[in-house]
Amino acid sequence: MATNDQKIDNKSTVSNMLENPMFQTFSKKETEKPSLSEYMEQLTSEFGEELDNLRQKEIFDHNKLQLLIESLRAGHKIYE
C-alpha cells in the first residue's frame, strides 16, 4: 500500500509530465468544441457507409430517418 509521501510523489510526477511539452499533444483548436456542422461532417465521413445502409433499409420511413438524424445531432451536446 502506498504511503502519503509516495502519493504526493506520484501527484508531482503526473503534474511534471503534464507540464512537459512532449505530453501536450492537443492544440487549443483540438480541444475546442466542434461546430454542429463539423461534428456531423466527421460523423458522416467516418460512418457514411453504415448510415447509407441504414437509410436504404425498408424499415426506415421518413419519421424514423428524422429520429436517427436528431439522435446523431444530440451526440454533439456531449461537447457542452
From Swiss-Prot:
The lineage of its organism: Eukaryota, Fungi, Dikarya, Ascomycota, Taphrinomycotina. Pfam families: Rsa3. The gene is rsa3. Associates with nucleolar pre-ribosomal particles. This is Ribosome assembly protein 3. The keyword Membrane does not apply. Keywords: Nucleus, Ribonucleoprotein, Ribosome biogenesis. The keyword Nucleotide-binding does not apply. InterPro entries: Ribosome_Assembly_3, Rsa3_C.
